[in-house]
Regions:
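Alpha-helical scaffold elements adjacent to nucleotide-binding pockets in ATP/GTP-utilizing enzyme cores
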Residues: 98, 135, 160, 164, ...
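Generic preference for hydrophobic
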Residues: 116, 187, 232-234
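Short, charged early-sequence alpha-helical segments and their helix-coil boundaries
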Residues: 37-48, 54-60, 310-331
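Canonical P-loop GTPase G-domain recognition
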Residues: 193, 199-257
Length: 331
């Protein structure tokens, strides 16, 4: 039997074993756990919200795990308590790719001032993002004052992470020719700070050149009147150089948000967006598992595939089977 009060006290006391159990509870999709998880989160919510929430993404091969290990270790040496969470929609298929990352984060994984949590295997991006957001509440209530949320893998995970953090850090590499090559379309717009990693040895000069070129491109993209133009820095996670400057720029961004009132507004907007996102996910789940929908969906899908039925008509029939009348229809 789960004692929610005992869990809440253990989390607030910063007991690692209880924190891990609390996160397992909020990640659970079992109906009997969901009510208990919400009760626990309601108790912890007043004690959360004071941490710096930072999203970390990167181009393939950038050395994200090595960066987070070095960056997080630097932060704990400065007296911070660091939590690392991940949004990995593929984790249910791969068995949790950040499990491998955790072993690569050799220093943070054993640092008493850090907590590295594998990505929840919730299957869908919505499910993973929900579990990560709720894990963040637990981590903050437990006293972790820096939460690093890593994007792993595919699709819209960057956008999902940007919607739950204060600042978004994008890691990239020096490339010959086009410095924007390899950065997914749309991800650049999310970035608040960029860092060209692996600025060491023979690559150091290339990394500095790349940082200058990217900074110029961003100035053009954001315009002269932008309140914040994302700075572009060079760093080496392997040699732990330039990481302090990355932290300084992230702190400057947070200070700007805080001093203009945008931090509070941003977090409130994120909560409202999150509320409606959960409504959409829950409705979609109910619709897909509805007996009436399940009985008609295979035939309708086949008819759409065969070109016998338009997608719009198929959607209307699915909604009729769900028992949700169209707008304007009686009853």
């Amino acid at each position: 039997m789960i004692d929610v009060d005992a869990y809440a006290k253990g989390v607030l006391d910063g007991k690692r074993a209880i924190v891990a159990r609390a996160i397992t509870l909020v990640e659970s999709t079992r109906p009997q756990h969901r009510a208990l998880a919400q009760e626990l989160l309601t108790a912890l919510l007043p004690h959360s919200g004071r941490a710096r929430r930072i999203g970390v993404s990167g181009v393939p091969g950038v050395g994200k795990s090595t960066f987070i290990d070095a960056f997080g270790t630097m932060l704990t040496s400065l007296g911070h308590r660091v939590a690392v969470l991940a949004v990995d929609p593929s984790s249910s298929r791969t068995g949790g790719s950040i499990l491998g990352d955790k072993t690569r984060m050799e220093r943070l994984a054993v640092d008493p001032a850090a907590f590295v949590r594998p990505s929840p295997t919730a299957g869908t991006l919505g499910g993973v993002a929900k579990a990560t957001r709720e894990s963040m509440v637990v981590m903050e209530a437990a006293g972790y004052d820096v939460v690093l949320v890593e994007t792993v893998g595919v699709g819209q995970s960057e956008t999902a992470v940007a919607d739950m953090v204060d600042s978004f850090l994008l890691l990239t590499l020096a490339r010959t020719g086009d410095q924007l090559q390899g950065i997914k379309k749309g991800v650049l717009e999310l970035a608040d700070v960029l860092a060209v990693n692996k600025a060491d040895g023979p690559h150091e000069r290339d990394a500095r050149t790349a940082a200058r070129e990217l900074a110029g491109a961003l100035r053009l993209m954001h315009g002269k009147d932008a309140v914040w133009t994302p700075p572009v820095l060079s760093c080496s996670a392997r040699e732990s150089t330039g990481l302090d400057t990355v932290w300084e720029r992230l702190e400057q961004h947070r200070t700007l948000l805080d001093s203009t009132g945008r931090l509070t507004a941003k977090r409130r907007d994120q909560q409202i967006d999150w509320t409606w996102s959960m409504v959409r996910d829950e409705l979609l789940d109910r619709l897909r598992t509805h007996p009436g929908v399940r009985s008609v969906a295979p035939d309708l899908e086949q008819r759409v595939r065969d070109g016998e039925l338009t997608a719009t008509l198929a959607a209307e029939r699915i909604l009729e089977a769900f028992g949700d009348p169209s707008p304007g229809s009686p009853g």
